[in-house]
Amino acid sequence: MKTATYFEQPSPQLTTLYHPDGKTPYPYWNILLRPAGSINASARDMAAYVQFYLNRGAVGGVQVAPAASIDRMETPTRTWEAQEGLKAGYGLSNYTSIHEGFVYHGHNGGVDGGITDMSYLPEYGVGYFYSVNSANGGAFGKIGDAIRAYITRSLTKPPVPAAGELPANAADYAGFYVPAAPRNELTHFLSSGLGLTRVRFDGGKLLLTSLGQFDQPFIPVSGAQFRYVPKKGPAEPIATAMLLRPNAEGRFTYLGGAMVRIPTGLAILQIALTAWFVLAFVAIVVYAPFWTIGGLIKRRRRPAERAMRLWPLIAVLSLVAFVALFVVSGNDAIQRLGNLTVYSIGLFATTVLFALASVASAIALLMARREEIRRFVWWFSILVTASLLIGTAYLAYWGVIGIRTWS
């Protein structure tokens, strides 16, 4: 590989990276953390890199690296599931992925405005590399689908293992799970809630239900390993899920990531509180226009109720602003949130305002004279204020209140 280097290169040798619009350029980003990659290389050199894997470490007939080293790179060993026998997963900068019934090895990557994928089928002797210089994930996915369809057009899919028996202790694993170690700590507060997953067993299958998925089937292969059977498309030919042995940290499953079981009561409470918060959020927004318009009519003004209705609305609007800032920062999140900008300061300010407004809602409720408040408004205020305080406590627990992304 004649051009590959960790170091920043003169601009004439670098391609320009663009936003999803294909017109607005990104500044070049030379990542300093080598475990993350940051290798600059030409497409020709990357093609040679794919060939290096396919030839099991040989280049031009010369064995540069032992074939055993390539095998080791492709083999996960350190994760719990790997130590219990699961072959699919992350090795040494090389992981397995399954597309249309074929098992690929390789790695992808991305920076602002640049996405790439290097994958190969060692058993068939074919592979590919491609990259795009635009943050257009949709186009990137379509290109990858087209390439994989082309290189596998005359290949026979690997056989699918016969269905095995459920482990004798499978019922012990039924229940609710949450991600044990999310990749992104910044959004841990979301994955802890939105990642709630239910595992159950029926008809000799493991059935997985999570947000956006219902009873996704996994077929037992051998031992505690399972292979996924998509409702559309070919079945996966290798096991990619596993029931892990319980340890001092709890009972875990591997379902594309380590999942830890939580008590059913806690899961139900989590679902109920989330539903309560969402309903309160919607109710505050829906109710606001009515009391706002009513406040313009003198005979309908109710000063005693004003603070009880205003503070929850401020809390909700601050949360909306928080989400909007995240969305608007999207394509430039590192630049906008990683520095002291109006976006990062906005996240800090809106979360603090949400907490203060939620507390102010409770104070307004406590200080209100019961006899001056309509019964409906009183109970409405209690329900929405309680939900806002619960939301504040949850976000504070995960460090979201007063978040400083620039530090």
Residue ranges: model-predicted function:
Residues G106, D117-Y120, Y124-S134, R251-L255, ...:
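Short, well-ordered beta-strand elements
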Residues M1-P122, I147:
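Short, surface-exposed loop or secondary-structure junction motifs
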Residues N55, N136, R183:
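Flexible, active-site-proximal loop/turn residues at the rims of small-molecule/cofactor binding pockets
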Residues D112, A135-G137:
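A short acidic/small-residue loop/turn micro-motif
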